[in-house]
Amino acid sequence: MGLSFTKLLGRLFSKKEMRILMVGLDAAGKTTILYKLKLGEIVTTIPTIGFNVETVEYKNISFTVWDVGGQDKIRPLWRHYFQNTQGLIFVVDSNDRDRVGEARDELHRMLNEDELRDAVLLVFANKQDLPNAMNAAEITDKLGLHSLRQRHWYIQSTCATSGEGLYEGLDWLSNNISSKA
């Protein structure tokens, strides 16, 4: 009895570590999101060629977040980051109606990869502060999320510059990755 109580306490109070891969088309807001979570402020960004990686501490969880560039020429490199990924954050520019089909294609291509079969999916419908932004329901439809039968997924409306919705997304990740782990 004492040993199981000790194990329970260890689970409750030990820091969990989670490997998160954040991808999406170029200019969706991935790097802005990463540094808003890490530093709590808006940083000036340039297009990411390669990746940024940061550890974000939140609610007794240490998220290692890999922010990988989204330009079309470097998207084939995404697969090099798939191994051991527990959670996938797919960032969508909710204002970019012209490329939401391209975003859908890239998302589904990734989700078909064997190395990501156990990863949960969090979609950040970003740039909700813009007047023509599609809402989360419209993004869900355009990305074909309801067709993902074997995948645990969630969509969160966000605004990277204000931070709105970002921590709600991390809450969902922490609750859903830990229940799968």
Swiss-Prot record:
<feature type="binding site">
    <location>
        <begin position="67"/>
        <end position="71"/>
    </location>
    <ligand>
        <name>GTP</name>
    </ligand>
</feature>
<comment type="similarity">
    <text>Belongs to the small GTPase superfamily. Arf family.</text>
</comment>
<dbReference type="GO" id="GO:0005525">
    <property type="term" value="F:GTP binding"/>
</dbReference>
<dbReference type="InterPro" id="IPR006689">
    <property type="entry name" value="Small_GTPase_ARF/SAR"/>
</dbReference>
<protein>
    <recommendedName>
        <fullName>ADP-ribosylation factor 1</fullName>
        <ecNumber>3.6.5.2</ecNumber>
    </recommendedName>
</protein>
<keyword id="KW-0931">ER-Golgi transport</keyword>
<keyword id="KW-0449">Lipoprotein</keyword>
<dbReference type="InterPro" id="IPR045872">
    <property type="entry name" value="Arf1-5-like"/>
</dbReference>
<dbReference type="GO" id="GO:0015031">
    <property type="term" value="P:protein transport"/>
</dbReference>
<dbReference type="InterPro" id="IPR005225">
    <property type="entry name" value="Small_GTP-bd"/>
</dbReference>
<feature type="binding site">
    <location>
        <begin position="126"/>
        <end position="129"/>
    </location>
    <ligand>
        <name>GTP</name>
    </ligand>
</feature>
<dbReference type="GO" id="GO:0005794">
    <property type="term" value="C:Golgi apparatus"/>
</dbReference>
<dbReference type="InterPro" id="IPR024156">
    <property type="entry name" value="Small_GTPase_ARF"/>
</dbReference>
<comment type="function">
    <text>GTP-binding protein involved in protein trafficking; may modulate vesicle budding and uncoating within the Golgi apparatus.</text>
</comment>
<feature type="binding site">
    <location>
        <begin position="24"/>
        <end position="31"/>
    </location>
    <ligand>
        <name>GTP</name>
    </ligand>
</feature>
<keyword id="KW-0519">Myristate</keyword>
<keyword id="KW-0813">Transport</keyword>
<keyword id="KW-0547">Nucleotide-binding</keyword>
<dbReference type="GO" id="GO:0016192">
    <property type="term" value="P:vesicle-mediated transport"/>
</dbReference>
<keyword id="KW-0342">GTP-binding</keyword>
<keyword id="KW-0378">Hydrolase</keyword>
<feature type="lipid moiety-binding region" description="N-myristoyl glycine">
    <location>
        <position position="2"/>
    </location>
</feature>
<dbReference type="InterPro" id="IPR027417">
    <property type="entry name" value="P-loop_NTPase"/>
</dbReference>
<keyword id="KW-0333">Golgi apparatus</keyword>
<dbReference type="GO" id="GO:0003924">
    <property type="term" value="F:GTPase activity"/>
</dbReference>
<dbReference type="Pfam" id="PF00025">
    <property type="entry name" value="Arf"/>
</dbReference>
<keyword id="KW-0653">Protein transport</keyword>
